[in-house]
Amino acid sequence: MNNDYLKTVQEKIKKILKSADKALFLSAQDNCSEMTRLVGCWILQDFPTINVNILKGENIMDATNKNHDILAIKEKNKFYLIDPTIWQFFKNKKNILLAKKDNMENCMEFAKQFYKGKWSISETLDKNCFQKMKEWEEVIKINICS
């Protein structure tokens, strides 16, 4: 996985989120769960030997009851922290890649410092996620059109 690949993924995300003709930060709101899983599945399709983990943050951004999902992708001995809906919190962010880390503990620490809140691994995606991709896309489209 390299920067060019991540830029391609980012453009796919933006295409979906901008389909409702709303500002990106508005379309990204309330779509982190489905978008994170959808993007994780795209990456898993392209790189079947990597590990795709969903990290869940609770009470993030100093807000009670505000939760958020991001990806921790392990490729070889490197972890990539990716937020497919980063724009809901940071309108002007140019990149979905938050950081590269050496281990999961450092990923959790970064997420806690960046977003605050309590972070944990909520699930690990496998090839079974491919069956739900269309469903997640539909939920995202419904969310951004409402």
What are these language model-derived features?
Residues M1-S146:
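A structural boundary/capping signal
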